[in-house]
Amino acid sequence: MLGFITRPPHQLLSLLCTGYRLPQISVLCTQPRPRAMAESSSTSWELPLVAVCQVTSTPNKQENFKTCAELVQEATRLGACLAFLPEAFDFIARNPAETLLLSEPLDGDLLGQYSQLARECGIWLSLGGFHERGQDWEQTQKIYNCHVLLNSKGSVVASYRKTHLCDVEIPGQGPMRESNYTMPGYALEPPVKTPAGKVGLAICYDMRFPELSLKLAQAGAEILTYPSAFGSVTGPAHWEVLLRARAIESQCYVIAAAQCGRHHETRASYGHSMVVDPWGTVVASCSEGPGLCLARIDLHFLQQMRQHLPVFQHRRPDLYGSLLPLS
């Protein structure tokens, strides 16, 4: 079982949060696991702990960094080995022109600050959705939506550029044309071995394309991560449903750090960051405000799930084609 979900008493969670300036950690467990698969070979305290951070980014990059740093430091204090930050953790601008103006290359000052933070805290960081000026910036004058994974030494171990750009018109939420200022990525990133398990990288809108999650799972992913900035209309309708579906069909943990609240006068995000286990249970979640939630990753439970429900062995590529392996 996930240690912070059922085994520690609620009083312990309250003690862990004492003195925390941001809203209290929220942990949710709503559905029991099947009895035959509920026991782990490890005690809960031996399982790796991850932290999912929820923030309200603004156009002020340094204020955003300060908020994220406080959450990462708190996650470190609580014993997390890996902290997940949402899409646009660096900033959310008022318009495309400001987005381009505030963007930086991966070797810029801002990512250097996060690298130092990871190194000082001794924690891995999933930085989902960095506004990156790529090597083709001078030619395209467009950026990449880049998910960066830092190890505990502050080194970049993987970077994935969002492949599915969000060009949509949602009634009541307003139009979005990410492709007006963003270039699509050209490849998926192979899953990366971390202290919590093998992590497959994706970003927000990617969760609507199950082929991506299946391909990452086939490549060895045990954890899929979807840092996001869902809106106030699509969030209540689709957010949890999509994340649970991706977890069930891929038989992976799904970790989704989210933006929340009002960023400026024209944009707000849904929040509700969460962790979903391979059974499809929401095992940890935040509410609507800034803060973090914690979960323990039980890879023994994941392997049990895959043995009891061997769906990848039952696939019929002769009927509907096969997914090409990651290069």
UniProtKB/Swiss-Prot annotation:
InterPro entries per record: C-N_Hydrolase, C-N_Hydrolase_sf, Nit1/2_C-N_Hydrolase, UPF0012_CS
Kindly identify the residues recorded as the active site. Answer: E87, K162, C204
In the UniProt record, the transit peptide is located at 1-36
Please verify whether the record's keywords include Hydrolase. Answer: yes
Q: What's a GO cellular component annotated to this UniProt protein?
A: mitochondrion
Pfam families, sorted: CN_hydrolase
Q: Give the EC class as a word.
A: hydrolase
EC number annotated for this UniProt entry: 3.5.1.128
Q: Is the Transport keyword given for this protein?
A: no
Domain (CN hydrolase) ranges: 47-299
Q: Name one GO molecular function term.
A: deaminated glutathione amidase activity
Give the keywords, sorted. Cytoplasm, Hydrolase, Mitochondrion, Transit peptide
Q: Name one GO biological process term.
A: amide catabolic process
**What catalytic reaction does the record list?**
N-(4-oxoglutaryl)-L-cysteinylglycine + H2O = L-cysteinylglycine + 2-oxoglutarate
What the record says about family reads: Belongs to the carbon-nitrogen hydrolase superfamily. NIT1/NIT2 family.
Tell me which PANTHER family the record gives.
DEAMINATED GLUTATHIONE AMIDASE, NITRILASE-RELATED
Role of this protein: Catalyzes the hydrolysis of the amide bond in N-(4-oxoglutarate)-L-cysteinylglycine (deaminated glutathione), a metabolite repair reaction to dispose of the harmful deaminated glutathione. Plays a role in cell growth and apoptosis: loss of expression promotes cell growth, resistance to DNA damage stress and increased incidence to NMBA-induced tumors. Has tumor suppressor properties that enhances the apoptotic responsiveness in cancer cells; this effect is additive to the tumor suppressor activity of FHIT. It is also a negative regulator of primary T-cells.
Q: What else is noted?
A: According to Rosetta Stone theory, the existence of a fusion protein in one genome predicts that the separate polypeptides expressed in other organisms function in the same cellular or biochemical pathway. In Drosophila melanogaster and Caenorhabditis elegans, NitFhit is a fusion protein composed of a C-terminal Fhit domain and a domain related to plant and bacterial nitrilase.
Know the name of this protein?
Deaminated glutathione amidase
Q: Quote the gene name from the UniProt entry.
A: Nit1
